[in-house]
Structures are given as structure tokens and as C-alpha cells.
């Protein structure tokens, strides 16, 4: 009896020793919350046989009866199915839809043998100042709003997490990635790569930062010219209300230049400062045209855009160049906010600069004759240029004498013409008078002749 008990004990020990060798290999499958996943179940027999899927509590999830599947009473009963077209090949996958992190666990597939599959479901959530998202692949936030991406993983798992931002730049953040002040360049596709048990799953989130595009916010124009203010945006399909308020250089308060709306990608002007005659196009990008720039417009403004998610601000600067020439002076100045790195210069065309200063006003006394150029430059880049034609100084200095000579000549000519006219009139009057005297003498002569003839005839008749 003791020998029989000892034999049974030995047999039990042998079974325990051999148990790890027959334990089925557990396959690991990674899934993403909200997606569908397929748990494999493969048999060596290439035909349709009976199978059953069970959870870790041995509750039936899904099985088959011939060519039909049957659904058990598990909590997954409304989210599971299988692929019948694979049954005849000895494959009986379990498809779980609309995955949740709570679906993570061990699943058993019973066929001619038992197979184990471990499902690990991960979820990526995003939170920012004006909202939150779970499982969404598209996020919109204003520039400057803090964004936090958090990975939710099943209990007991220890995945390796790697973050990659736009431009394939790697970020190290562990289970959380925080962008405290997202800029325009942070917009794009962010990828979270999760690795566990030599399996990998990725989350891709498209982040759109609602902001002004990175372009210069300083505009340069010559007095009298037209200038166009352009403000390209990183978005087109957001409705908004905006306005541009302007504070001229030296002014104590700002003035509303224009207000507008953007609805369904169409811009409409609400109000505008009439003297400016500002023009705005109906289509994006956002553009304002000032037909004629005056020096008093030089200054700074604030463009405000009110969106449903918040407010965007953009500073705007206008620099105006004014060039003048007088009899003895040539001046050039710029008005408005300028950087101290800019250089204002005056020089004759195709010659070295006569005056070049890091100031807002330059001038030349008694400038040489020719074409002068006023240049506002940022190192080798010319931002503004204006040309002035100056007459030769010799001509300018002799101008009074030339004017006196010219006026004297004109006056002498007028006197000569007057004298000639006077002489001509006098001669004409003398000639007229002579003609009249000659006519009178002729008439008198004819009268005397007539009288003598009459007297002779009378004497003859008396005789």
C-alpha cells in the first residue's frame, strides 16, 4: 500500500515536471481603443471544426455550430464576430470591434487544443486649454494653448513608449507628452509608438495650430504709393470676427481702421475708416489695400481675430519713406517703427554713399546735380528706395542772373516792338495827312480851272 502511494506520488511529480513543456504558448496582440482587433486561432487541420472562444473567466464569447457562429453571454456579445471564409482553412479568428482598454486580458480558443491570446488595448487622450479628445486623430487648438498627450495602458503592462513630432523629430515624454506653448511649427502629425513583447502599435494624431503664418509683420511703402497688408493664416474653414485698430506715430490713442467677418471662407467688410479708402478682397488670404500712403499713417496696429476657440492677435507695423529736395537741401526720412539695425542712406546713383547713417533722417546741403537715391536697407537687402533728380549747382547759382538777363531781354524786345509800332503808326498818319493835302490841292486846282473857263465863255458872249 505504501509502495502504491509512493508510485502515485512519483507519477504526480513527473506530471508537474513535464507541465511547462506542454503549456500552450501565449500570443500577444496589441490594439488601439476605438479600433477593431483580430485574435488568431489556428489549427493544424485545414478544415472547419468546432471551436469556442472564452474570456479569462471562462465565459463563452463566440463559438460555432456547423457553418454558423453563436454568441455567448459575455459583455462583448454586441461587439464580436468571426471570419467564416477562413474556417475551412482551419483559422477561427475572434474579431472585437470598438475596443476599450477594459477589453485587455487573456482569451482562450478551444479547438483540438487550447490556445491562449493576450490582448493589450491602449488609448491616447489629448487635453488642451479649450477642450479634450479621446481617440480622435484630429486636434485643433490656438497658438499658445497648452497641449498634453497621455497614453493609457492596461494594468500590469510595461510598454516602451516613443514620441515623434513633425519632421520625424523624437521627443522623450514617457507616458505623457506636454507642449506648453505650441507654435505654428508644432502643427502636423504626432506619432506615439508603443512596443510590448516584440509587438508594436502606433497612434497618429494630426495637430493643427490655429495661428498667423510666419511672415514679416512690418510693411514698407513710399509716401504716395499703394501698400497691401497681407496676413496668411494656417486655416481657412474657421468662422471668425476681426478688426484692425491703428495707432499712428505720436498719437495718444488708436483708431479703428476696419472690421470684418469670415464665414464659410468668405470675407465681408463690416466697417471701415472712410478717409483711408481701405479695400478688402472677399477670399483668403486676408488682405487689406491702402490706395495711397501718407506720412501720417506711419505707426503700429493690432489685428484681432475672434474665433470660437479663442482670440488671436497680430502686431502690424507700417514704415513710410518721405524724400524732398529744395534749392539747397536734399532730405530723406523714414517714419514709423524701425529696427536700429536698419541703415538709411543717400547717394548719387551708381556712386558711393554720400551720407549713410543708422538714423531716421539724412540730408545733404548743396547736393551735386544728378539722380540721388534714398535707400532703407537691412544689411545687403534694400527695403525701400526713392529717387530724386537734382539740377546742376552751376545752373542753380546762375539762375538769378539768367533770369534777370532773360527778363531784361524780354523787356527790351517789348520796348523795341512798341517803338516800331509807334513809328509805323506815325509814318502811316503822316502819309495819310500828305495824301489828304494832295487831294485838297488837286480839288482846289480843278476848281480854279473850272472858274477861269466859265469867265472866258462869258466874255466872248458879250462881244
From Swiss-Prot:
GO cellular component: external side of plasma membrane; membrane raft
Localisation: Cell membrane
Glycosylated sites: 123, 168, 176, 324, 329, 389
Keyword annotations: Adaptive immunity, Cell membrane, Disulfide bond, Glycoprotein, Immunity, Immunoglobulin domain, Lipoprotein, Membrane, Palmitate, Phosphoprotein, Repeat, Signal, Transmembrane, Transmembrane helix
Annotated membrane topology: Single-pass type I membrane protein
Any one biological process term the GO annotation gives: maintenance of protein location in cell
PTM summary: Palmitoylation and association with LCK contribute to the enrichment of CD4 in lipid rafts.
Ranges of the Cytoplasmic topological domain: 424-463
Cysteines engaged in disulfide bonds, as pairs: 41-109, 332-374
SUPFAM superfamilies: Immunoglobulin
Main function: Integral membrane glycoprotein that plays an essential role in the immune response and serves multiple functions in responses against both external and internal offenses. In T-cells, functions primarily as a coreceptor for MHC class II molecule:peptide complex. The antigens presented by class II peptides are derived from extracellular proteins while class I peptides are derived from cytosolic proteins. Interacts simultaneously with the T-cell receptor (TCR) and the MHC class II presented by antigen presenting cells (APCs).
Quaternary assembly: Forms disulfide-linked homodimers at the cell surface. Interacts with LCK. Interacts with PTK2/FAK1. Binds to P4HB/PDI. Interacts with IL16; this interaction induces a CD4-dependent signaling in lymphocytes. Interacts (via Ig-like V-type domain) with MHCII alpha chain (via alpha-2 domain) and beta chain (via beta-2 domain); this interaction increases the affinity of TCR for peptide-MHCII. CD4 oligomerization via Ig-like C2-type 2 and 3 domains appears to be required for stable binding to MHCII and adhesion between T cells and APCs.
Swiss-Prot/TrEMBL domain comment: The Ig-like V-type domain mediates the interaction with MHCII.
Name of the protein in question: T-cell surface glycoprotein CD4
Organism name: Canis lupus familiaris (Dog)
Amino acid at each position: 500500500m505504501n509502495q502504491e502511494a509512493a508510485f502515485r506520488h512519483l507519477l504526480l511529480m513527473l506530471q508537474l515536471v513535464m507541465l511547462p513543456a506542454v503549456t500552450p504558448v501565449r500570443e500577444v496582440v496589441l490594439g488601439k481603443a476605438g479600433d477593431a482587433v483580430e485574435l488568431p486561432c489556428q489549427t493544424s487541420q485545414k478544415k472547419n471544426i468546432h471551436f469556442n472562444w472564452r474570456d479569462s473567466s471562462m465565459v463563452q464569447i463566440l463559438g460555432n455550430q456547423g457553418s454558423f457562429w453563436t454568441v455567448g453571454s459575455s459583455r462583448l456579445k454586441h461587439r464580436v464576430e468571426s471570419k467564416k471564409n477562413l474556417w475551412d482553412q482551419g483559422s477561427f479568428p475572434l474579431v472585437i470591434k470598438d475596443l476599450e482598454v477594459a477589453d485587455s486580458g487573456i482569451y482562450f480558443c478551444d479547438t483540438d487544443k487550447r490556445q491562449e491570446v493576450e490582448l493589450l488595448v491602449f488609448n491616447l487622450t489629448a487635453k488642451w486649454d479649450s477642450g479634450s479628445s479621446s481617440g480622435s486623430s484630429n486636434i485643433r487648438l490656438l497658438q499658445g494653448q497648452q497641449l498634453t498627450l497621455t497614453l493609457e495602458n492596461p494594468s500590469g503592462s510595461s510598454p516602451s513608449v516613443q514620441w515623434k513630432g513633425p519632421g520625424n523629430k523624437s521627443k522623450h515624454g514617457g507616458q505623457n507628452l506636454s507642449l506648453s506653448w505650441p507654435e505654428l511649427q508644432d502643427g502636423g502629425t504626432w506619432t506615439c509608438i508603443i512596443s510590448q513583447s516584440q509587438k508594436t502599435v502606433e497612434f497618429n494624431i494630426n495637430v493643427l495650430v490655429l495661428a498667423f503664418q510666419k511672415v514679416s509683420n512690418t510693411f514698407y511703402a513710399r509716401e504716395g504709393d499703394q501698400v497691401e497688408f497681407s496676413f496668411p493664416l494656417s486655416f481657412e474653414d474657421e468662422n471668425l470676427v476681426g478688426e484692425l485698430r491703428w495707432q499712428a506715430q505720436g498719437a495718444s490713442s488708436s483708431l479703428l481702421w476696419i472690421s470684418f467677418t469670415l464665414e464659410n471662407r468668405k470675407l465681408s467688410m463690416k466697417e471701415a475708416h472712410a478717409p483711408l479708402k481701405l479695400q478688402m478682397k472677399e477670399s483668403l488670404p486676408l488682405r487689406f489695400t491702402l490706395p495711397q500712403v501718407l506720412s501720417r499713417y506711419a505707426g503700429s496696429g493690432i489685428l484681432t481675430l475672434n474665433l470660437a476657440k479663442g482670440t488671436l492677435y497680430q502686431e502690424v507695423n507700417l514704415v513710410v519713406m518721405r524724400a524732398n529736395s529744395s534749392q539747397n537741401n536734399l532730405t530723406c526720412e523714414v517714419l514709423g517703427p524701425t529696427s536700429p539695425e536698419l541703415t538709411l542712406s543717400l547717394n548719387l546713383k551708381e556712386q558711393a554713399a554720400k551720407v549713410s547713417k543708422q538714423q531716421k533722417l539724412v540730408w545733404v546741403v548743396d547736393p551735386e546735380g544728378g539722380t540721388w537715391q534714398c535707400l532703407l536697407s537691412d544689411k545687403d537687402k534694400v527695403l525701400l528706395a526713392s529717387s530724386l533728380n537734382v539740377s546742376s549747382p552751376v545752373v542753380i547759382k546762375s539762375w538769378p542772373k539768367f533770369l534777370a538777363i532773360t527778363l531784361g531781354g524780354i523787356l527790351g524786345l517789348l520796348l523795341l516792338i512798341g517803338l516800331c509800332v509807334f513809328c509805323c503808326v506815325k509814318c502811316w498818319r503822316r502819309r495819310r495827312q500828305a495824301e489828304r493835302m494832295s487831294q485838297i490841292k488837286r480839288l482846289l486846282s480843278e476848281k480854279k480851272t473850272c472858274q477861269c473857263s466859265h469867265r472866258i465863255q462869258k466874255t466872248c458872249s458879250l462881244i
